[in-house]
């Protein structure tokens, strides 16, 4: 499971590096949809079945509509791919090398083990016992997101705002 999660995380980051290298809107939308599917697979791999399904339906449904309009507005006769510019290809390769270096650095200093073992989850456990519980981890995760991850919510909101700005700029053709 650890290697599957690590592989999905690397694919997710490489997909976002591929999207941020500003290819044609057709290819950018495809990479963003594939990265969204991989992100949902990460959530499913961590045990969040309901959350993974909701992210899949809401995020990918919205992105399909946005990129459908973007592709219709910014249609090109010869769309620009990642290999058409040397600087774009170098940017993708540098991003990939940085990701591999980060994984190797985290593995060398036992940072990867600390992240993937989940040793400090004692404060998240609400129901312990032999019987069946009525509280699922998905609903606990939403509460923990707003309790422990206040800045994560702020960064997520800012990222969504920047994403909307990028989509508008791509649709205008700049």
Swiss-Prot record:
Alphabetic keyword roster: Electron transport, Membrane, Mitochondrion, Mitochondrion inner membrane, NAD, Respiratory chain, Translocase, Transmembrane, Transmembrane helix, Transport, Ubiquinone
Main location group: mitochondrion
Enzyme Commission code(s) on record: 7.1.1.2
Enzyme class, first EC level, given as a word: translocase
GO biological process per UniProt: mitochondrial electron transport, NADH to ubiquinone; mitochondrial respiratory chain complex I assembly
Localization, UniProt: Mitochondrion inner membrane
Transmembrane segments: 1-21, 24-44, 47-67, 86-106, 151-171
Stored InterPro entries: ComplexI_Subunit6, NADH_UbQ/plastoQ_OxRdtase_su6, Nuo/plastoQ_OxRdtase_6_NuoJ
PANTHER family: NADH UBIQUINONE OXIDOREDUCTASE SUBUNIT ND6 (PTHR11435), NADH-UBIQUINONE OXIDOREDUCTASE CHAIN 6 (PTHR11435:SF1)
Similarity comment text for this entry: Belongs to the complex I subunit 6 family.
Function recorded in the entry: Core subunit of the mitochondrial membrane respiratory chain NADH dehydrogenase (Complex I) which catalyzes electron transfer from NADH through the respiratory chain, using ubiquinone as an electron acceptor. Essential for the catalytic activity and assembly of complex I.
Name of the molecule in the record: NADH-ubiquinone oxidoreductase chain 6
Protein's organism: Hylobates lar (Lar gibbon)
């Amino acid at each position: 499971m650890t290697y599957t999660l690590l592989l999905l995380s690397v694919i997710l980051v490489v997909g976002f590096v591929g999207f941020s290298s500003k290819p044609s809107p057709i290819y950018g939308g495809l990479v963003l949809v594939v990265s969204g599917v991989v992100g949902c697979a990460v959530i499913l791999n961590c045990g969040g079945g309901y959350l993974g399904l909701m992210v899949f339906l809401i995020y990918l449904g919205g992105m399909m509509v946005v990129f459908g309009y973007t592709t219709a507005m910014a249609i090109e006769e010869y769309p620009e791919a990642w290999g058409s510019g040397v600087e774009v290809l170098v940017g993708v390769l540098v991003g990939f090398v940085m990701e591999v270096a980060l994984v190797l650095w985290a593995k060398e200093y036992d940072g990867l083990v600390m992240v993937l073992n989940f040793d400090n989850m004692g404060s998240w456990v609400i129901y312990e016992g032999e019987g069946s519980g009525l509280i699922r981890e998905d609903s606990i995760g939403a509460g923990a997101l707003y309790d422990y991850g206040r800045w994560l919510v702020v960064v997520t909101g800012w990222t969504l705002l920047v994403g909307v700005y990028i989509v508008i700029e791509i649709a205008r053709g700049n």
